[in-house]
């Protein structure tokens, strides 16, 4: 109980701005960089962006509008984007930077949450193993 209270106190305020708010702001900024990298590579429309990311249009729209859930991009979404053959190199770099930052705790999360995220990111997907989801 004391540990939770201490953590809440540490993250409640710093220089008048919530630490959590700062972390979420950094996370949203990195996701906006991903969107800009797609535009810079010529993927301007939502259809083009969703194809480049290998995601559904609705998922792409939610992510790129930085209105994604508070915990950020899931390991499954990150892996799907990285597996997309149409993903431009700069967008790939932004996703890898986002992943490294998330693992380092830049966007928050306990050590346990970050460890679980790491395990999910590094676990091979059926596509990486040469299987299709249809064959499973």
Outline where the language-model segments fall.
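A short, Lys/Arg-rich alpha-helix, primarily the initiator
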Residues: 3-42
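Short alpha-helical "recognition helix" segments of helix-turn-helix
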Residues: 49-50
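Recognition helix of helix-turn-helix/homeodomain-like DNA-binding domains
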Residues: 54-71
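Short intrinsically disordered terminal tails
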Residues: 1-4, 19, 131-136
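Short, charged recognition helix plus adjacent turn
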Residues: 89-136
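A general structural motif at alpha-helix termini
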Residues: 53, 64, 82, 95-99, ...
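DNA major-groove recognition helix of helix-turn-helix/homeodomain DNA-binding modules
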Residues: 72-93
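Helix-turn-helix DNA-binding elements, focusing on the entry/boundary residues of the two helices
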Residues: 45-46
